[in-house]
Amino acid sequence: MGCCCCLPSIPESSRTIDEHLPLSRATPSSLSNAYSSPLSPPIPLAITNINLQTSPPKLPRTQGNSSEASPGLTQVVPEKKTWHVDDLTDFELKKQYREAIDECPICLEEYEIDNPKLLTKCGHDFHLACILAWMERSEACPVCDKELVLTES
């Protein structure tokens, strides 16, 4: 057997010499008509515009239980909820957070005896070497961007 080009039913004389030329060397007239003819436009999709559909008019809303509003048009406003918050200050919360995460925010390494941590007035702690190098470039805390003041301890 063989491929479709090798079938005996197709005479070799029907093949043209253009079949063996690369497209870059072929003349434009020898290119297929599919490449030179314009493409047909795409088939349009059936689109329905949601904005064109009619909707019932919106009724005016009133708050509360006024006597002049009809019962179908009133809106009940829920009561204000209060949330219980512990009596912890921001500094105490930051202290609890620092104890939970015991690493320097600049270098992301844990604190060790060789490289101690230093606490700032804004409540953040850093390696001594890291914060001193930071203070050469900036006067703001690397975490909260407040003025960087070191504590005396």
Curated annotation (Swiss-Prot):
Q: What name appears for this protein in its UniProt entry?
A: E3 ubiquitin-protein ligase AIRP1
Task: Tell me which residue ranges form RING-type zinc fingers.
Answer: 104-145
Q: What happens when the gene is disrupted?
A: No visible phenotype under normal growth conditions, but mutant seeds are insensitive to germination inhibition by abscisic acid (ABA).
**Remarks, anything else?**
Plants over-expressing AIRP1 exhibit tolerance to severe drought stress.
Q: Which InterPro entries match?
A: Znf_RING (IPR001841), Znf_RING/FYVE/PHD (IPR013083)
Cell compartment(s), UniProt = Cytoplasm, Cytosol
Tell me the function of this protein. Answer: Possesses E3 ubiquitin-protein ligase activity in vitro when associated with the E2 enzyme UBC8 in vitro. Plays combinatory roles with AIRP2 in the positive regulation of the abscisic acid-mediated drought stress response.
Which PANTHER family does UniProt cross-reference here? E3 UBIQUITIN-PROTEIN LIGASE AIRP1, ZINC FINGER, RING/FYVE/PHD-TYPE
EC number, UniProt record? 2.3.2.27
Taxon lineage: Eukaryota, Viridiplantae, Streptophyta, Embryophyta, Tracheophyta
Entry keyword set: Cytoplasm, Metal-binding, Stress response, Transferase, Ubl conjugation pathway, Zinc, Zinc-finger
